[in-house]
């Protein structure tokens, strides 16, 4: 049957191999790997402006000049544009059928839909109605190409995308907002959305520091506030020259009970960070947010952002326990002897060395498995998406694991348990300084989840904790973050580009904490890890 067939495709076999590489490491969430679908920000602007005919002409020009190794892929992109046009034709025919049976305002509405669908997306949009209609069809086709999981496809700076079309007719803020409500409804199909974590951003500054807020920014905020829908996530770029009016327009979101709250991003911080990580100055203003909080360059960046997930809390647990899970009793890591220690006192005295050494070894295995997962998803090419990710110029698929089809490429690692580890290191230091004779007692208390030693639990809970203006532990957290980030960045993805650290936990601090035993910061077995850090 179909399920059996899908279980033995080349994609399924390659993905199975990736998880085989991970072995038992993923059984209790030491780390996790996945084949990344979605999590990109296509640049829809050229297709909105020129239509599929303009994009097809560019493809044909580049196809004629390229080598034989890329001609087939250029052809695939052209066929994918045909699919978008077929979809538009179907809707146009449906609108025409509805028009024939309607009267009054309904007839006028269907007539407008029919005429619009016969124009876009083949040709460029000339007003906001046409631009939104074209965008919806483009987005629908892109999501269908990655069915069933187009997670975290994100719009980018929607106010900059749509403002030129609003301005062409000087459409009022109120009318523009009413059209954007239809756009937001599109993202929420029936009782769910196309996919979770799709993001839309407004605001921000240019590469020269000029504020780029425009009338469409406010129209989009009005639409979001009135609709209060869960998808797409609303994000806002801020900077030192953000106008007072934008802050005032945002206030209603934060002070209305039950209303969605936008995520805020600081251009003045992110611009230098992105530039330091290799983003060209000319591309900085086009950074947007994919998914929850991942900054990527619109139309140029395959960040592969959720390719791997690392659980520092679990690694610390195994370092202290001699490699035996205190959750299940399963042997998952190195013994004390393999870590170079004769007893538990030596383990605690050398906990930082042991921890970072084990992080490096687990990260090495994690990235090998993650790269294998990327190779699996690379078998499922995405020619339509690639027309908006640099493929028109390169003739290379966005997911290609042998040749880089986007200007920027990397792989992500979401890191969990930073504060748990930092607090634990300080607690261990405190115990060794004040009562070193209790080293074995601490390890036993962790093994039994403090059930027989509530006094030890109370002692650990009273040690200094991150985030309480305690310089010692805050410095420790900084050191843990820097060292772990350096370890992760030393690993290379399928194209030889670095893995990037992301100290964030969309909600997985709950799941990953469930697989971590008691830790020296006083956290009990299966309790969640720190949110974000």
Q: Where does each model-flagged region fall?
A:
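Conserved catalytic cores of very large enzyme subunits
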Residues: 1-75, 108-112, 124-533
């Amino acid at each position: 049957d179909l399920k059996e067939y899908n279980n033995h495709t080349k994609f399924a076999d390659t993905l199975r191999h990736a998880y085989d590489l991970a072995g038992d490491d993923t059984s209790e969430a030491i780390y996790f790997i996945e084949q990344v679908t979605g999590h990109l920000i296509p640049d829809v602007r050229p297709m909105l402006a020129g239509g599929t005919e303009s994009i097809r002409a560019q493809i044909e020009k580049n196809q004629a000049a390229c080598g034989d190794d890329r001609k087939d892929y250029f052809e695939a992109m052209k066929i994918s544009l045909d699919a978008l046009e077929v979809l538009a034709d179907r809707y146009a025919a449906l609108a025409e059928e509805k028009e024939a049976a309607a009267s009054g305002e309904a007839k006028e509405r269907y007539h407008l839909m029919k005429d619009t669908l016969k124009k876009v997306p083949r040709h460029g949009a000339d007003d906001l109605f046409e631009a939104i209609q074209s965008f919806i069809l483009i987005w629908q086709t892109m999501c269908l190409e990655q069915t069933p999981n187009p997670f975290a496809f994100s719009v980018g700076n929607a106010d900059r995308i749509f403002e030129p079309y609003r301005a062409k007719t000087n459409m009022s803020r109120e009318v523009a907002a009413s059209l954007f409500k239809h756009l937001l409804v599109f993202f929420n199909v029936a009782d769910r959305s196309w996919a979770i974590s799709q993001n839309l951003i407004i605001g921000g500054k240019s590469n020269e520091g000029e504020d780029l807020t425009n009338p469409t920014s406010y129209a989009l905020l009005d639409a979001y506030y009135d609709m209060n829908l869960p998808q797409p996530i609303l994000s806002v770029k801020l900077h030192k020259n953000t106008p007072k009016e934008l802050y005032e327009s945002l206030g209603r979101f934060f002070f209305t009970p039950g209303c969605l709250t936008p995520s805020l991003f600081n251009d003045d911080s992110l611009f230098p960070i992105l530039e330091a990580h290799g983003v060209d100055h000319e591309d900085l203003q086009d950074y947007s947010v994919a998914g929850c909080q991942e900054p990527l360059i619109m139309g140029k960046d395959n960040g592969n952002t959720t390719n791997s997930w690392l659980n520092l809390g679990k690694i610390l647990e195994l370092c202290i326990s001699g490699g035996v899970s205190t959750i299940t009793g399963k042997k998952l890591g190195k013994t004390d002897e393999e870590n170079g220690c004769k007893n538990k006192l030596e383990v605690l005295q050398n906990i930082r060395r042991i921890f970072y050494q084990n992080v490096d070894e687990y990260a090495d295995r994690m990235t090998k498995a993650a790269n294998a997962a990327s190779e699996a998803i690379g078998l499922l090419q995405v020619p339509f998406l690639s027309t908006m990710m640099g493929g028109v110029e390169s003739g290379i698929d966005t997911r290609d694991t042998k040749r880089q089809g986007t200007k920027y490429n990397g792989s992500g690692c979401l890191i969990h348990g930073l504060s748990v580890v930092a607090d634990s290191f300080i607690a261990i230091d405190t115990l060794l300084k004040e009562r070193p004779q209790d080293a074995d007692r601490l390890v036993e208390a962790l093994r039994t989840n403090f059930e027989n030693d509530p006094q030890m639990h109370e002692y650990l809970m009273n040690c200094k904790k991150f985030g309480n203006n305690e310089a010692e532990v805050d410095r420790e957290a900084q050191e843990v973050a820097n060292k772990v980030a350096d370890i992760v960045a030393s690993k290379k993805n399928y194209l030889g580009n670095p893995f990037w650290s992301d100290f964030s936990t969309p909600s997985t601090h709950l799941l990953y904490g469930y697989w971590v035993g008691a830790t020296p910061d006083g956290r009990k077995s299966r309790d969640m890890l720190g949110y974000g850090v």
